[in-house]
């Protein structure tokens, strides 16, 4: 089947980029599903739309049909990553990202002085780079499914680079009980199997170690108001969006003690800005330039209203800090 390297054209009913549609919730098994949103690839590298379903019983949101391994690889290529970074930079500046990483690291300084730390979904290693200011004696390693983690190693932002997912066969066994802290910042939504990723995270943690998970909140009111223009829906790359209650229950079932649940500080003030940027993404460059003042207005509203949003159901993310049990 002939394809373009950028925009594959599917000429049969079989789509190699998607698995068969499932009729039950991957989290609780319920068959009471509702399509929450249908959204196109914002970069238009592929035709069609991607659907996100929500379970009426447990609230888990998930891509359905889900990307296949081939589809996941396509949407994590370096070429796609660079173009996505350009779109994201219109919503959240690199300086804002650096400030956010520093603030997050500062808030985790209560973890004292861990010897070793694995940042999962590290990308270019920007969080470890920022965290070294507050944890100067900690060894930071990075894990990511893309080649960005190898660049982070070359540029000295991580001490070891691991390519893949925690649940990649052999990964957890190789890193067994090596780390005092494992962080998964906006990584779990990209994982094909979030539960397997959590189990693997606990495998690489030492007894008594800390697991920090931050995920977009599918119950955020912006998700309802903005629909497919709510950035954390993240189609086609976001595969799962578990609500806080589900993730907390899963970690407790795995024997963890929940130390912190936080909806306030993980909120990122970009919902309105991102909605405008996604609306303008398919427009010609001249129209995007002419409409740039709209982005400025939206950004101002996001930041002015952030103190209110982060204290209400408009908060767009949550964080859980859990401690692994000391004995098996």
Regions found by a protein language model. Name each.
Residues 3-88:
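N-terminal juxtadomain amphipathic helix
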Residues 87-103:
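Conserved SAM-binding loop and adjacent beta-strand
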């Amino acid at each position: 089947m002939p394809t373009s390297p950028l925009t594959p054209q599917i000429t049969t009913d079989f789509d190699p980029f998607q698995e068969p549609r499932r009729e039950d919730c991957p989290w609780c098994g319920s068959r009471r599903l509702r399509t929450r949103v249908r959204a196109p690839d914002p970069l238009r590298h592929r035709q069609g739309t991607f659907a996100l379903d929500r379970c009426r019983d447990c609230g888990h949101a998930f891509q359905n049909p889900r990307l296949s391994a081939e589809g996941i690889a396509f949407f994590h290529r370096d070429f796609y990553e660079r173009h996505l970074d350009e779109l994201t930079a219109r919503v959240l500046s690199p300086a804002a990202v650096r400030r956010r990483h520093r603030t997050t690291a500062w808030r985790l300084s209560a973890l004292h002085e861990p010897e070793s730390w694995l940042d999962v979904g590290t990308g270019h290693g920007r969080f470890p780079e920022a965290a070294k200011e507050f944890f100067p004696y900690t060894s930071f390693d990075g894990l990511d499914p893309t080649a960005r983690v190898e660049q982070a190693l070359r540029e000295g932002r991580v001490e070891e680079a691991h390519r893949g997912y925690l649940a990649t066969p052999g990964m957890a066994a190789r890193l067994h009980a090596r780390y005092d802290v494992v962080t998964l910042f906006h990584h779990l939504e990209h994982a094909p199997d979030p539960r397997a990723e959590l189990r693997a995270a606990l495998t690489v943690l030492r007894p008594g170690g800390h697991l920090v998970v931050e995920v977009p909140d599918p119950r955020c009111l912006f998700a309802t108001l903005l629909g497919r223009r709510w950035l954390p829906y993240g189609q086609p790359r976001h595969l799962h969006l578990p609500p806080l209650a589900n993730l907390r229950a899963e970690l407790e079932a795995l024997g963890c003690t929940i130390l912190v649940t936080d909806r306030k500080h993980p909120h990122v003030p970009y919902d309105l800005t991102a909605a405008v940027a996604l609306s303008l993404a398919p427009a010609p460059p001249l129209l995007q330039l002419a409409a740039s003042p709209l982005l400025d207005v939206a950004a101002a509203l996001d930041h002015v209203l952030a103190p209110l949003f982060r204290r209400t159901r408009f908060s767009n993310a949550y964080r859980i800090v859990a401690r692994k049990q000391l004995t098996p």
